[in-house]
């Protein structure tokens, strides 16, 4: 397993949780962004800076993620792409994307985009909360524990 992070919009507190998880579980972690990122000194953790542009970081992750990897993203089309490859996808609020729910999420996203394009103020996401941080940490820990248990089976 490799953890890929769509890091441009990922909250710093989530990155910190991921840094600790990579060390604890000894799993490689790559943050992908169109800007320089600070990472702790670790052979497991690296940052990739991609050129600025629409969905360039997403395209990098979609190209490099493979079945069994974990992708952290709030971008629903990216989540759909990596799920189609057999990877896992989790958003920074702790919601796991699944093949069963991704079509509905894409449809809702497209509808909201159409409303915004027609001038309707749809508001934005709620502020990132302590409950979101906790939900992410719990979901991440459960996913990594499950992965470790599967890897240790003969």
UniProtKB/Swiss-Prot annotation:
Which regions span the lipid bilayer? none
User: Which protein are we looking at?
Assistant: UPF0178 protein BAV3236
Which domain of life does the protein's organism represent? Bacteria
Q: Which cysteines are joined by disulfide bonds?
A: none
Q: Which is one Pfam family of this protein?
A: DUF188
Q: Which CDD domains match?
A: PIN_YqxD-like
Which family is this protein grouped under?
A: Belongs to the UPF0178 family.
Instruction: Return the InterPro entries for the record.
Output: UPF0178 (IPR003791)
